[in-house]
């Protein structure tokens, strides 16, 4: 399926028009994770685009999970590499969150045990 969805006007110079704007790689991520990936107000997005030689577009999805759809444009290799990189960063964020929750649970149990001993 050859779909072009680009609405951005500031297409980076490394993206070839129109061939790189067809068939974007797409994945969904929670808005909280997106802030981790791209920084506050997307401050790191242009840097990540430049490093990955790809272009990103974001689309809010009406969902209770506050999902954002990320469209990745560029050459086939750059799209796949950028998607892998972003998904890996998102997975790392989730693992760090889980570790934090586990540490918090352990601390809570320790506090509860300490209160029982007193």
UniProtKB/Swiss-Prot annotation:
Keywords linked to the UniProt accession: Cytoplasm, Developmental protein, RNA-binding
Family matches, as InterPro entries: KH_dom_type_1_sf (IPR036612), MOEP19_KH-like (IPR031952)
Explain the consequences of disrupting this gene.
Mice develop normally and are fertile. ES cells derived from these mice demonstrate normal morphology, proliferation and differentiation.
Main localisation: cytoplasm
In alphabetical order, the GO MF annotations are:
mRNA binding
Q: Which sequence ranges form a coiled-coil region, renumbered to this chain?
A: none
Task: Give an example GO cellular component term for this record.
Answer: cytoplasm
The job of this chain, per UniProt, is described as: Involved in the maintenance of embryonic stem (ES) cell pluripotency. Dispensable for self-renewal of pluripotent ES cells and establishment of germ cells. Associates with specific target mRNAs.
For this chain, the family text in UniProt reads:
Belongs to the KHDC1 family.
User: What name goes with this protein?
Assistant: Developmental pluripotency-associated protein 5A
């Amino acid at each position: 399926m050859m779909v072009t969805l680009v609405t951005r006007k500031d297409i980076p110079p490394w993206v070839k028009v129109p061939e790189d704007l067809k068939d974007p790689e797409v994945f969904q991520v929670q808005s909280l994770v997106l802030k981790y990936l791209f920084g506050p107000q997307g401050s790191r997005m242009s840097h990540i685009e430049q490093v990955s030689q790809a272009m990103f577009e974001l689309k809010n999805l009406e969902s209770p999970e506050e999902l954002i759809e990320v469209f990745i444009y560029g050459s086939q290799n750059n799209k796949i590499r950028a998607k892998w990189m972003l998904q890996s960063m998102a997975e790392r964020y989730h693992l760090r969150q889980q570790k934090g929750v586990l540490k918090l649970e352990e601390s809570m149990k320790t506090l509860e045990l300490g209160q029982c001993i007193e």
